[in-house]
Amino acid sequence: MLRLQDAEAVVGGRIVWSRLCLQVEAGEFIAVLGPNGSGKSTLLKAILGLTAARGTVQVMGQRAGRANRSVGYVPQRRAFDAALRIRGVDVVSLGLDGARWGTPVPAVSRLLAPRRTAARRARIAEVIDLVGASAYAHRPIGDCSGGEQQRLLIAQALVRRPRLLLLDEALDSLDVPSQAGVSALICDVCRSQQVAVVMVAHDVNPVAPYLDRVMYLARGTAVIGTPDDVITSEALSDLYGITVEVLRDSIGRLTVVSRPSVPLCHRFRGVT
């Protein structure tokens, strides 16, 4: 599904990361972790073919950017303006209009053949139901909560039946219940639809129970493995090149700190 072999990204003359090797299969859920500036979003852009990368970056056996019709993408975002009156269902329909990233111009449905229009409507309704958004999909998007908006954006990314789903900070700015709900949704889509998922996350806590592996980026390189193997004092000390401690609190959440007293600003929940 996704293959990186000795991949290297250079942005503005700086090597962001190099020698990355990763293979992601159908139905696998991977989180990409690391400090700010470590190249997490750059990795997703390289997979999309939006950032040049050396080495091998392939999706569905094709060079990055050649198989984007098979890729769903949810970029970083801010909440929609409360005054925005476009409906959630219309936001989802944008996912059918073109294979380019960003906000495409919606197709004018009255110009389409009736059969095609009916098929579009059926697929949009199907994917809205898949993400559990049927109850509010016809509301203005600005009236929806953050979690509801994110479900609709995930539906937009899934409407073309992608084989690979890329999510950039999909839980950012959501409240804790919404984070839990969206995390469970992503896992359900991954398993039931056999979609490979690569998700950039600043806080792995909400998705930790669902992950197959994590890729932790720092200092231009990465360590890859199960959460239990990677989020450890030993593994992260080797990665950062300094002494790092992974601390667990009374409810099982993990905090990663360097010594003597400089926090690395990562909080994780251990996977037991």
Give names to the regions the model predicted.
Residues 140-144, 148:
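Conserved ABC ATPase signature
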Residues 161:
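Conserved catalytic motifs of ABC-family nucleotide-binding domains
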Residues 52-69:
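Conserved ABC transporter NBD signature motif
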Residues 165-169:
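Catalytic Walker B motif of ABC-type/P-loop ATPase nucleotide-binding domains
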Residues 33-35:
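The feature captures the beta-strand-to-loop junction immediately N-terminal to the Walker
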Residues 233, 239-272:
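ABC ATPase nucleotide-binding domains
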Residues 106-136:
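Conserved ABC ATPase "signature" region
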